[in-house]
C-alpha cells in the first residue's frame, strides 16, 4: 500500500489515496500504521475518498483507532496531499464528519482553512455543564484534586480551553488526561492550556482526545482564540504559538467562520507491506 507522510507543525499524518483503491478496516489499519514502533508512526491516518457533495471526502483515524470529527492540522495536510498527488487545485472543499471544510493553498506549504463557525452551547459541544445562557464560558469542572475552570467550544470536535498564568508550570499530561475522560464530557474532549502573552499572541499546549500530548492542534488553536474572545482576553486575530510552530487564527465576528492559516509539509513517501 502506497502512502505519503505529512506534518503540520509536527502533528504528523499518514495520507492514503482511496480515490483509486478500496481499503477496508480503516480504524484497525490506522492504529496499526500509526504505531511508532511496529508501523510507520504518526498521530493519525487520513484517507481521501471521492465525494458526492464536495471535491473529496476524508476520514481521519487517531493513533488509538478512534475516528474524530475533524482535525485542523490534518485538513491542511490533506489539502497539500491532494494538490501534490491527486489534482493540482488550489481551492478544495472536503467532506468531513464535522461538515464541509473549505481550504486554499496560499503558497508552497501554506494552507488557509475556513474552519466554520464555532458551536458554543453546552449541548452542541457536548458538555453536561452550562452557564445561565446555555453556554460553557469559564465554568468549573470537578476533578479529583478539586475544580478547574475552562471554556467549552466545538470546532466540529469538542474542546475545553483552560487559561493558565504560566504554561511551563502546567502538568498537561496529568490534567489533560483527567479532563478528557471527565464525565462532564459525554464524547470526551480535547484539552487546551493557554497562556495569554498579549491580546494578539497566545501560547498553547494541547492534550488531544484519543492521542495525548501532541506538538500542535489546529482545531485547538481555533477553539483557544474563540475562548479568548468570549472571556475578553484576546483580540479576534492572533498568533497562536504551539510546541510545533505557529498558526494564525482569526474569528472576525460572532457567528462567523474561524479562519486558520498554517504550514503543511511532506516528510516522506513509501510502500507499507501489510
UniProtKB/Swiss-Prot annotation:
Pfam families: DAP_epimerase. GO terms for molecular function: diaminopimelate epimerase activity. The gene is dapF. The lineage of its organism: Bacteria, Pseudomonadati, Elusimicrobiota, Elusimicrobia, Elusimicrobiales. GO terms for biological process: lysine biosynthetic process via diaminopimelate. Its main location: cytoplasm. The keyword Nucleus does not apply. GO terms for cellular component: cytosol. Its EC number is 5.1.1.7. Gene3D superfamilies: Diaminopimelate Epimerase, Chain A, domain 1. The record marks 159, 208 as: Could be important to modulate the pK values of the two catalytic cysteine residues. The active site is at residues 71, 217. This is Diaminopimelate epimerase. It catalyses: (2S,6S)-2,6-diaminopimelate = meso-2,6-diaminopimelate. Pathway: Amino-acid biosynthesis; L-lysine biosynthesis via DAP pathway; DL-2,6-diaminopimelate from LL-2,6-diaminopimelate: step 1/1. It is an enzyme of class 5 (isomerase). Belongs to the diaminopimelate epimerase family. InterPro entries: DAP_epimerase_AS (IPR018510), DAP_epimerase_DapF (IPR001653). Catalyzes the stereoinversion of LL-2,6-diaminopimelate (L,L-DAP) to meso-diaminopimelate (meso-DAP), a precursor of L-lysine and an essential component of the bacterial peptidoglycan. It comes from the Bacteria. Keywords: Amino-acid biosynthesis, Cytoplasm, Isomerase, Lysine biosynthesis. The keyword Amino-acid biosynthesis applies. Substrate binds at residues 11, 62, 72-73, 157, 190, 208-209, 218-219. It is found in: Cytoplasm.
Amino acid at each position: 500500500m502506497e502512502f505519503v507522510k505529512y506534518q503540520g507543525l509536527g502533528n504528523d499524518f499518514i495520507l492514503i489515496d482511496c480515490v483509486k483503491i478500496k481499503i477496508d478496516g480503516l480504524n484497525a489499519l490506522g492504529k496499526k500504521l500509526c504505531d511508532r514502533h511496529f508501523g510507520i508512526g504518526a498521530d493519525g491516518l487520513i484517507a481521501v475518498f471521492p465525494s458526492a457533495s464536495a471535491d473529496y471526502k476524508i476520514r481521519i483515524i487517531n493513533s488509538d483507532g478512534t475516528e474524530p470529527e475533524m482535525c485542523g492540522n490534518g485538513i491542511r495536510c490533506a489539502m497539500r496531499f491532494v494538490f501534490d498527488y491527486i489534482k493540482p487545485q488550489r481551492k478544495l472543499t472536503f467532506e468531513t464528519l464535522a461538515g464541509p471544510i473549505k481550504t486554499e493553498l496560499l503558497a508552497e506549504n501554506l494552507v488557509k482553512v475556513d474552519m466554520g463557525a464555532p458551536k458554543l452551547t453546552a449541548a452542541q459541544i457536548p458538555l453536561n455543564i452550562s452557564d445561565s445562557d446555555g453556554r460553557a464560558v469559564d465554568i468549573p469542572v470537578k476533578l479529583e484534586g478539586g475544580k478547574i475552570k475552562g471554556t467549552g467550544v466545538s470546532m466540529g470536535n469538542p474542546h475545553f480551553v483552560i487559561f493558565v498564568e504560566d504554561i511551563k508550570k502546567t502538568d498537561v499530561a496529568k490534567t489533560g488526561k483527567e479532563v478528557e475522560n471527565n464525565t462532564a464530557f459525554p464524547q470526551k474532549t480535547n484539552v487546551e492550556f493557554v497562556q495569554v502573552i498579549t491580546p494578539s499572541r497566545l501560547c498553547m499546549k494541547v492534550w488531544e482526545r484519543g492521542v495525548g500530548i501532541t506538538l500542535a492542534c489546529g482545531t485547538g488553536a481555533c477553539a483557544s482564540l474563540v475562548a479568548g474572545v468570549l472571556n475578553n482576553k484576546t483580540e479576534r486575530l492572533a498568533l497562536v504559538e504551539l510546541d510545533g510552530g505557529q498558526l494564525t487564527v482569526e474569528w472576525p465576528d460572532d457567528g462567523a467562520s474561524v479562519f486558520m492559516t498554517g504550514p503543511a509539509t511532506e516528510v516522506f513517501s513509501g510502500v507499507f507491506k501489510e
